[in-house]
Amino acid sequence: DSTHGFCGAALSTNVIHFWKSDVGKWEWEKVIDVENEPHPDWPIPVPGVMSAILVSMDDKYLYLNNWLHGDMRQYDITDPHNPKLTGQIWMGGLLGRAPEVNGIKVAGGPQMFQLSLDGKRLYVTTSLFSTWDNQFYPEIRTQGGVMVMIDCDVENGGMNINENFIVDFGKEPNGPSRCHETRYPGGDCTSDIWL
């Protein structure tokens, strides 16, 4: 019954919160702003390129990616006007903060992601569009993409990469392959197959 919602702006790397006011007027505000980061090989600071956002089934957490920076973030949105950063992990990306995950070199950055219905498992893949992949992460052509699982703390907030799970699509038959969207048998947070 809530009128609150969120949308992500990819290139400016912002999250916009919108809601219907008590007088029935739609309002909006920018509630998350990811700063561009300097890079020695770029003439301008690198934007995060937030290609997706996701809200947990209990409306407690919002997840977002920064494909070029290389991080996934978790925000507590209990107060939708003031999201609080509660978790952040690094995997791949242009900033070089996590070039390897679980012993595998990551080509690309966190891109598509899917959350389990209980909110405890977030699966993240690294390919956006092949032309963009090839431009920003040319090594993905020969290495392929990966999928990692992030364990999410649904009580206190926080995220950790699961050290016992990684799918290396570079080793797939007829590969290397790229990975994009993930779906769960039985349902996930952005499909209605579980209804």
Predicted regions and their residues:
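A detector of repeated loop/turn-to-beta-strand junctions in beta-rich toroidal repeat architectures
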Residues: 12, 69, 83, 141-146
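Surface-exposed loop and turn segments in beta-propeller and other repeat-based domains
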Residues: 25-46, 86-105, 162-195
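Beta-propeller domains
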Residues: 1-80
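Short loop/turn segments immediately following beta-strands, especially the blade-tip
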Residues: 17-30, 74-86, 137-139, 149-162
